[in-house]
Amino acid sequence: RRQRQMCIRDRAGIVTACSISYKFNGSSIDYTKVKTISFENFPNRSAGFVWGPMENMFNTALQDIYMQQTRLKQVKRSGDLQLSGEITNYEAFNKGIGSDGYSSMVELRMTVRVNFVNSSNPTENMNGQQFSASREYNSNQQLSAVQDELVNQMIKEIVEQIFNATVANW
């Protein structure tokens, strides 16, 4: 969190207006106790179907949010914070039925199971916590035409949920 104060003074030096702004970086990490983070690869173990690029997209996005929004140093193993888990579900199913009796919408859903270790505060540890996101698309579209965009949106949402649950504490 950064604080910035701006004040306007009149000719006599009297403050006539003042504003204070705060910039939040999204995390509430005590950097005197927590300096490093380690990630295990989150494999795609979906019982539904598997889309090849998803595993790499997810792992990259997860690491990126911590590297961009914290001052933690990434280490290969045994970080002060440790994240591991797996993509447990990726599926599509019919959502709505149109007047013609056919499905008008398809829902795409992704679920990730996360284990989190905070070595400086074990009360914040999580074991098997699930995070999910879903998106809908018109059944007139082929999944291959919308999959990249929708999976990116779901990954972004899930990664933000994980970040908030592990280091944002709000």
Where are the model-predicted features located?
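Extracytoplasmic/periplasmic, Sec-exported soluble proteins
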Residues: 46, 50-58, 104-108, 143-155
